[in-house]
Amino acid sequence: SYMEMPNTVPNALTQELLQDKYDRASEVSLANYSFFMGASNDNLDEVLKTDPKKVCGVKIFMGASTGNMLVDNRTTLEGIFSGSDMLIATHCEDEQTIRDNSARAKAQWGEDVPIEQHPVIRSAEACYKSSSLAMELATKHNARLHILHISTAKETELFRNDIPMEDKRITAEACIHHLWFTDADYAKKGTHIKWNPAVKSIEDRNAVRQAIIEDRIDIIATDHAPHTLEEKSNKYFSAPSGGPLVQHALPALFDMYHDGVFSLEKIVEKTS
C-alpha cells in the first residue's frame, strides 16, 4: 500500500486534480493506494470540499520543501485546523528560521554552501518551533494531527505514550533516513542524503529511535521521493531534497534489528 503526497506535477490542490490521481491509479496501480489533498495559502475552499472518506488526509507544508506548497498564512492554517474533519498531516519546519539561516550561509559561502550546513540551515529549532505551532493549533481546534518525519530530540518530548493509539488526536512518525544516518555521514554521502527535514546529530537520531521504542512516535514511514542520482549530485541549493526509500526501508530496518536497535515485533507494529 502507498499514500502519495500532493507535491507532484501538477500539485494536487484542487478536487479535479485529486480525482485525476484516483482515476489513473484505478487503471494502473498494482497496490493499494490513497492520496493526500494538498494545501496552499489560497486553496482553503478546495481543501474543505474534500470528502474525508476518500482521502488519507490533507497535507500541509508548514515549511517550504520540494514542490513549493508552503502554507504560512495563519488565517489559512486556522481555517484548515478548525474546519477540516480529515487527518491533517504536517511537514513541520519554520520557514522564517530557515530563510534567516539560509541568508547567513549564503553571505558566507555564496552558492557553494557545504552540505554540512544543511542541518544548520534547516535547524532543530526550526523543526521544534513549527511542530509546537501545529500541536497548538490541533489542541485549540481538537483537530486530528499527524506530524510527519520527526527528526530532533527536542520534538520527541512533545509526544505522549500514556494513552492508547486509537484515542490519540496527535500522532507522529519517523522516517528511515532519520533512523539510519547522522550529520557525520554528510562528509561521505554529500547531497545524496539531503532531506527535509535534515539528517541531524547522532543524539537526535538516537532520541528518535528511543521515541519509537517508547511509543511516543507511532509510525515508521519512507518519505519516498524518486529523485535521480544525477539530480541528487548537484550543488547544495540545486540538489533536490528527498530520496528513493520504498525499496530500502525494510532491509534497513532488518539491519537495525540485527544491530539490536529494534525488535522484530516493534518493526511490525510501526510499519503495519
PLM features: what roles do these ranges have?
Residues 1-97:
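Divalent-metal coordination cores built from histidine and acidic residues
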Residues 9, 62-154, 219, 224-228:
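Divalent metal-binding pocket/active-site signature
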Residues 15, 96-112, 129-130, 155-163, ...:
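Histidine/acidic-residue-rich catalytic or RNA/ligand-binding cores of hydrolases
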Residues 33, 58, 91, 145, ...:
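Divalent metal-coordination and catalytic microenvironments
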Residues 37-41, 64-79, 146-161, 195-209:
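Active-site glycine- and acidic-residue-rich loops that bind
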Residues 52-58, 84-86, 141, 163-170, ...:
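Glycine-enriched alpha-helix->loop->beta-strand junction motifs that scaffold or abut catalytic
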Residues 112-133, 137-142, 192, 213-214, ...:
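His/Asp/Glu-enriched, well-ordered alpha-helical/loop segment
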Residues 139, 150-183, 207-222, 226-227:
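Hard-cation-handling environments
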